[in-house]
């Protein structure tokens, strides 16, 4: 048995052993509630999906990390570039897909960048400290969330205002940013965030400011290369007013921007090298969310305007400008806690400037129904009629049955789903600066999955999912964008387990197997394992250990245009925190890549070695 199988087997055996040796004095756990797979608060046992939830507590145990680094620890997900230089482009490889198949929501509003090649939202713009919780649904979710929700929806909820009149939270972190071969421990990372929030009668407010500056590492591999700094600023303001028990209105405005030095492919050889190139991205968002509640139901509107300006300064430089208007209006109604219905209309208007301004719009009516029976059968089903100004109309739908049964103090459930999604070519692929093709056809995805889950009220849960995903008309790039002539099929297995019933100890682990039936997907590991152990030593001191195994991948060496095998690697991270002054002050430390593992994430690019950061969080 090789080391990979020892690791996987060891983690599963440890968790199962701990399950059978649970502390008899363990406190009964509260029922877990999930939202994103139906937009209703449903007990997890009544959901037909394995929704990933990241709580505020977990975020606090990962302070100093980026959002991409945190998400990268979850099953079925590989965020390529999250281990490299801070400004590295990110690849969202979820269930064998890529960036264009992942939809991001922030406080219920769809966000993307129409000028980007894959129309995705750039997670480098997000300040993790401003987030309250995250839910991730894997699989096709276009029925509820529309175009691009083919492999996952990342649903981000930002922090809400305190009930106090004035509350202040401040975090500051300093640390190193060095490669495996450069272990001088110079301070090159500075992270700061401040939040001022509160409630005055029916009025509430929250203002956030964040800054992240990281230097000390070159994008191109080699310790003698010029360092490539990354700098980001985030500001946001959200205001709300509760007019009555039934009606609430909230509005927000935010400005996010980052600047990073990058390395590129200079003339005349056009080989990857240490250069003085730069990349700048600036995002402005403003939105409003009125909500009216009535008996057993509510009507809500999430509307936002986004403006994005990007510039690449290099031998192949470009300037991109994009705007979008998104409006999602829906009615939710609960029929006697058995039928949960949503009827909605989603509108999107997207513009981007290339040689001239290009645009498209979508108008999607949608319907979703959840049935929760008393005898264990649950059904989540719905349909969306996507109307695209350039590609006409397309029906997408989802059928997601599940069956639960009581087992001791918990439950067991079996579930499955059949879901379709529709991804229209984006503006950059149709009209952009590099290889545009106005004759592209839309991509269509079908996802079939089935799984089992068991959980009890003592804090133990385990689940497993098998999925198969078929892509038709996959958009690929050769010398220009084109549709692949062959369908692509991705199969996979995801296993998750967690245990919180032993006093002061929490354990979680996940394993992912992903395989493209024919062909190659670059930088996608076939096997991946994550393990976390956290222990609360007393009311003040907490420590945790994270382990990640990433299996072999294939990447292209763009100096030779030959594919190469990348070795598997393992990384261990440690986190410590200590509370002071009645929990108003917290000191914490992160040690990442504890064993200073030497590995390659992307051919030709740097990866981070052992790094240390120290921080404090003050709450007033």
Task: Write out the residue ranges for each language-model feature.
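Structural signature of Gram-negative outer-membrane beta-barrels, strongest in the C-terminal barrel
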Residues: 244, 336-342, 346-469, 502, ...
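Periplasmic-side early beta-strands and strand-to-turn transitions of outer-membrane beta-barrels
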Residues: 171-187, 191-277, 552
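Extracytoplasmic beta-strand/coil segments of soluble accessory domains associated
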Residues: 68, 72-110
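N-terminal periplasmic "start-of-domain" segments of outer-membrane beta-barrel proteins
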Residues: 32-62, 91
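Conserved C-terminal beta-signal and adjacent last beta-strands/turns
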Residues: 6-8, 21, 85, 197-200, ...
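Gram-negative outer-membrane beta-barrel transporters
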Residues: 171, 375, 466-470, 484-557, ...
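Outer-membrane beta-barrel signature, preferentially recognizing the C-terminal barrel domain
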Residues: 268-289, 293, 415-500, 521-527, ...
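Short acidic/polar hinge/loop motifs at secondary-structure boundaries
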Residues: 111-138
């Amino acid at each position: 048995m090789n080391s990979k199988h020892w690791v996987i087997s060891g983690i599963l055996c440890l968790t199962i052993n701990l399950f059978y040796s649970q502390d008899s004095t363990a406190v009964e756990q509260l029922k877990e509630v999930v939202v994103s797979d139906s937009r209703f608060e449903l007990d997890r046992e009544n959901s037909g999906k394995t929704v990933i939830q990241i709580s505020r507590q977990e975020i606090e145990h990962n302070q100093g990390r980026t959002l991409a680094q945190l998400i990268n620890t979850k099953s079925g997900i590989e965020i390529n570039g999250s281990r490299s230089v801070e400004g590295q482009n990110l690849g969202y490889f979820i269930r064998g897909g890529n960036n264009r198949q992942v939809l991001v929501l922030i406080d219920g509003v769809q966000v993307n960048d129409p000028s980007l090649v894959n129309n995705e939202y750039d997670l480098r713009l997000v300040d993790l400290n401003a987030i309250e919780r995250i839910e991730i649904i894997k699989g096709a979710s276009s029925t509820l969330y529309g175009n691009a929700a083919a492999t996952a929806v990342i649903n981000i909820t930002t922090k809400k205002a305190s009930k106090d009149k004035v509350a202040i939270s401040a975090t500051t972190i300093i640390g190193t940013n060095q490669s495996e071969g450069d272990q001088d421990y110079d301070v090159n990372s500075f992270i700061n965030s401040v939040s001022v929030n509160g409630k005055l009668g029916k009025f509430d407010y929250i203002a956030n400011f964040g800054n992240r500056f990281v230097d000390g590492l070159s994008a191109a591999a080699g310790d003698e290369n010029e360092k490539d700094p990354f700098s980001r600023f985030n500001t946001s303001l959200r205001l709300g007013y509760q007019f009555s028990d039934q009606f609430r209105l909230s509005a927000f405005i935010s400005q996010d921007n980052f600047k990073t030095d990058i390395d590129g492919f200079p003339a005349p050889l056009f080989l990857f090298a240490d250069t003085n190139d730069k990349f700048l991205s600036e995002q402005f968002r403003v939105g409003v969310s009125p909500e009216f509640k009535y008996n057993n139901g509510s009507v809500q509107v999430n509307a936002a305007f986004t403006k994005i300006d990007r510039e690449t300064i290099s031998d192949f430089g470009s300037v991109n400008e994009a705007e979008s208007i998104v409006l999602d209006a829906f009615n939710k109604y609960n029929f006697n806690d058995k039928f949960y219905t949503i009827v909605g209309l989603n509108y999107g208007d997207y513009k981007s400037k290339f040689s001239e301004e290009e645009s498209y719009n979508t108008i999607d009516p949608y319907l979703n129904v959840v049935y929760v029976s008393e005898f264990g059968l649950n059904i989540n089903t719905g349909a969306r009629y996507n109307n695209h100004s350039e590609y006409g109309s397309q029906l997408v739908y989802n059928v997601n049955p599940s069956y639960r049964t009581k087992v001791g103090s918990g439950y067991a459930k079996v579930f499955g789903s059949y879901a379709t999604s529709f991804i229209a070519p984006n503006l950059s692929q149709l009209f952009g600066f590099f290889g545009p093709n106005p004759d592209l056809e839309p991509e269509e995805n079908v996802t079939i999955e089935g799984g089992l889950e068991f959980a009890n009220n003592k804090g133990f849960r385990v689940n497993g999912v098998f999925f198969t995903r078929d892509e038709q008309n996959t958009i690929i790039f050769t010398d220009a964008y084109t549709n692949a002539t062959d369908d692509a099929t991705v199969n996979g297995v995801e296993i998750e387990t967690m245990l919180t019933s032993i006093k002061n100890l929490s354990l979680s682990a996940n394993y992912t197997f992903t395989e493209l039936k024919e062909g190659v997907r670059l930088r996608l590991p076939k096997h991946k394992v994550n393990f976390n152990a956290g222990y609360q030593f007393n009311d003040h001191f907490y420590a945790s250990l994270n382990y990640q195994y990433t299996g072999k991948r294939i990447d292209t060496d763009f100096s030779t245009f030959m594919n190469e095998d990348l070795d598997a690697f393992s990384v261990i991270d440690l986190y410590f925190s200590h509370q002071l002054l009645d929990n108003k002050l917290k000191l914490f430390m992160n040690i990442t890549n504890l064993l200073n593992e030497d590995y390659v994430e992307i051919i030709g690019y740097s990866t981070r070695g052992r790094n240390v950061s120290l921080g404090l969080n003050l709450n007033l």
